[in-house]
A protein has these predicted regions:
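Feature marks short, highly hydrophobic, charge-poor N-terminal signal-anchor/signal peptide-like helices
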Residues: 1-5
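Hydrophobic membrane-insertion alpha-helices, especially the h-region
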Residues: 8-16
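Short intrinsically disordered coil segments
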Residues: 9, 124-126, 195
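Ser/Thr/Pro/Gly-rich low-complexity linker/stalk segments immediately outside membranes or between
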Residues: 21-31
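Fold-level signature of zinc-dependent metallopeptidase catalytic domains
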Residues: 32-47
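Short, histidine-centered active-site or binding-site loop motifs used for metal coordination
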Residues: 39-41, 140-143, 184
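Metzincin-family zinc-dependent endopeptidase catalytic domain
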Residues: 49-162, 166-170
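Post-HEXXH active-site segment of zinc metalloproteases
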Residues: 170-194
């Protein structure tokens, strides 16, 4: 009988550890800095203001952080896009966002363009990029045509992922059910992650 309780106790510890890993970046770490949310688009185009306001609300609600909207977008020129795939170069674009970072503020650029990463040629697209306290998030691949309500859930998860990294210094991990999973490569994987 003693062994049964010991096994149950050990299983409980294992599950508690897994839950801690799942919430480590969002609920467990307080924000260390505010975030500037900035639209990223081409001249003459614009990122939906309603999308940005919703994103700011999600980040404030989920992370308890101060989020402000940038007054002006980061504009992209033609050299930010691959000439054949017409995807934005995530590394190039996050470098354009980075100058907005200050010693006491992180920055997250939000774009509706499809992205690729020259650093990950094994992947046909990128959902975002990060460099220090600068991040970039693409909404392009978040759509779930089979379940349209899931589109916003996916986007919320990506916002919390980047927000937790940029504002809370949350580390990535190897738990595929965590928003901070290091191996995230597709929007479908977001469906398996808790919020």
């Amino acid at each position: 009988m003693e062994w049964v309780w010991l096994i149950v106790f050990a299983a409980g510890l294992a599950l508690a550890g897994r839950a801690y890993l799942r919430s480590d970046g969002a609920g467990e770490l307080p924000p260390k800095r505010p975030l500037l949310l900035v639209p990223v688009c081409s001249p003459g185009d614009r990122t939906s203001p309603a999308l940005l306001e919703w994103a700011a609300g999600c980040l404030a609600e989920e992370l308890g952080a101060k989020v402000t909207l940038a007054e002006r977008p980061v504009y992209l020129q033609k050299d930010a896009f691959h000439p054949h795939t017409r995807q934005g170069d995530a590394v190039h674009i996050v470098n354009l966002v980075e100058p907005l970072v200050t010693p006491d503020r992180a920055v997250l650029g939000v774009t509706e363009y499809d992205l690729h990463s020259p650093m990950r040629r094994d992947l046909p697209f990128a959902m975002g990029a990060r460099k220090g306290w600068a991040g970039l998030l693409s909404t392009y691949r978040m759509e779930d045509r089979a379940n349209p309500d899931n589109t916003r859930v996916r986007l919320r998860k990506m916002l919390v992922r980047y927000g937790a990294e940029l504002m809370c210094d949350a580390p990535r991990n190897e738990d595929p059910t965590s928003l901070l999973f290091n191996g995230l490569q597709s929007p479908e994987q977001l469906d398996e992650m808790g919020l």
